[in-house]
Amino acid sequence: MSKTGGNDSKSTLYCSFCGKSQHEVRKLIAGPTVFICDECVELCMDIIREESKSSLVKSRDGVPTPKEIRRVLDDYVIGQDFAKKVLSVAVHNHYKRLAHATKHNDVELAKSNIMLIGPTGSGKTLLAQTLARILDVPFTMADATTLTEAGYVGEDVENIILKLLQASDYNVERAQRGIVYIDEIDKISRKSDNPSITRDVSGEGVQQALLKIMEGTVASVPPQGGRKHPQQEFLQVDTTNILFICGGAFAGLERIISQRGKGTSIGFGATVQAPDDRRTGEIFRSVEPEDLLKFGLIPEFVGRLPVLATLEDLDEAALKKILQEPKNALVKQYQRLFEMENVDLTFQDEALSLVARKAIERKTGARGLRSILETILLDTMYDLPGLESVEQVVIGPEVVEGKSRPLYIHGDRNKDAPASVSA
C-alpha cells in the first residue's frame, strides 16, 4: 500500500498496482497488505479472457473440440442447445476436414454448409459471429435481400467473397478458410411455383448464382468492388473450403411442416384437422428438405445446405438471462455506460421480467430488448450528465410500465453524509 506524505498519509489509500488514489477510482479493494482498484481488476479480467480464448481445448487435429466450441457459445448465446450442438459438430468436422485435406487422398470429404432456421431474434446471427470469434478465421455477413443476378441493379454474389477478402486484409489464403453468413435467406425463395414471363432476378436467380460459390469454385473477385471499374485486375479465390452458413426466419414454413402428412379432403366426409398449437420453434424441429422446397427454395440450393439447425422461440426466462448473463449482456452494457458518469445502475428483478414480456408481445425476440431499454432509460441518460451527487439509479417495474420515473439515490462521495433519495 502506498501512502502520501504529511497528514494525508493516514487517510489516503492508493492502488498497489497502478498507484491511483482512492479519490481517482470508483472502488478500492483491500487485501492483507495491498489494495487494488476496479480499473486494475477490469484490466486483469481482459487479460484472462484473451488468454482463455487462445487456450481452447483442441483435438489432435489442432481444431477446437465440439464440447469446447459449445462451451464458448454458451458464454455469448443463451439457450438454443440443439442448434449449438449441431453447429459445434458441423464446424469441428469442417475444419478437421481442412486439416486432413492433404493427408488422405483416397476419400474426399465433402463440405457441409449449414442452414439456420429460427424465429426473428432467436440468435442466428450471434451464433455465426461467435463461431468466427472462437476459430479466429475471417468472417463476413451478407444480406440476401440485396443480391441480384449478374447484370441487374444490386449486388453480385461475388461481392460476398470480396467482403471476406476485406475482412482478411486481402490475404487470399486466410479468406479461403473463412466463414460467410448469409442472412434473410428465406427472402430469396421462388415467388411462385408457376413459371412467369418476368425474370425473378432477386429470388430463384440469386439461388442459382449462389450455387457455384457455395459448392466450390474459383471466383474472380474485383478488389475495388464490381462493375464501376471494368479494367481492374481480378483476384482468384477458391471457395471450396469456405464455410457458408445461411439463416432465415422462414415465416409461414411452420404451416407447411404442420400440413405435411395430414393430406387434404373436402366434402361432408372430410376429416376436421385440429390446429397445431405448438410454438413455431417446436414445429421447426420437424423440418425436412421437402418443406424447404415447398417454401420456394430450389432443390439444388437445398442440397448445398445439408446441415439443418433449428432455433426455438425465446421464452421469458431465456430473455431475462439474455439481459443479464452473457459476457456482453445488455444490462452490463448500460451499467458500464452509467459507470462513466460514476453512477450505479440497478434493475429490479420484476422490472427485467416486464422487459422480457414486452419483447415477447412485440414478437421481436432478443433483438427487441435493446429498443425497450433505450426507451426506458432515455430520460435518465438525458438528465444524468447535468445532475450532481447522484450515486445510484434504480429501475423498478413501474418505470418499465411508464407509471413512474427511475429512483435517484443521491450522496456525497467525499464526505460522510447520509444518502438522499428522489424520484
From Swiss-Prot:
PROSITE patterns: CLPX_ZB
Keyword Zinc appears in the UniProt entry: yes
CDD domains on file: RecA-like_ClpX (cd19497)
GO cellular component: HslUV protease complex
Keyword Ribosomal protein among record annotations: no
InterPro entries: AAA+_ATPase, ATP-dep_Clp_protease_ClpX, ATPase_AAA_core, Clp_ATPase_C, Clp_protease_ATP-bd_su_ClpX, ClpX_bact, P-loop_NTPase, Znf_CppX_C4
GO molecular function term, any single one: ATP hydrolysis activity
Keywords linked to the UniProt accession: ATP-binding, Chaperone, Metal-binding, Nucleotide-binding, Zinc
Residues binding Zn(2+), per UniProt: 15, 18, 37, 40
Residue positions binding ATP: 119-126
ClpX-type ZB domain residues: 3-56
Biological process (GO), any one: proteolysis involved in protein catabolic process
PANTHER family: ATP-DEPENDENT CLP PROTEASE ATP-BINDING SUBUNIT CLPX-LIKE, MITOCHONDRIAL, ATP-DEPENDENT CLP PROTEASE ATP-BINDING SUBUNIT CLPX-LIKE, MITOCHONDRIAL-RELATED
Oligomer and partners: Component of the ClpX-ClpP complex. Forms a hexameric ring that, in the presence of ATP, binds to fourteen ClpP subunits assembled into a disk-like structure with a central cavity, resembling the structure of eukaryotic proteasomes.
Function: ATP-dependent specificity component of the Clp protease. It directs the protease to specific substrates. Can perform chaperone functions in the absence of ClpP.
Similarity comment text for this entry: Belongs to the ClpX chaperone family.
UniProt protein name: ATP-dependent Clp protease ATP-binding subunit ClpX
Lineage: Bacteria, Pseudomonadati, Pseudomonadota, Alphaproteobacteria, Hyphomicrobiales
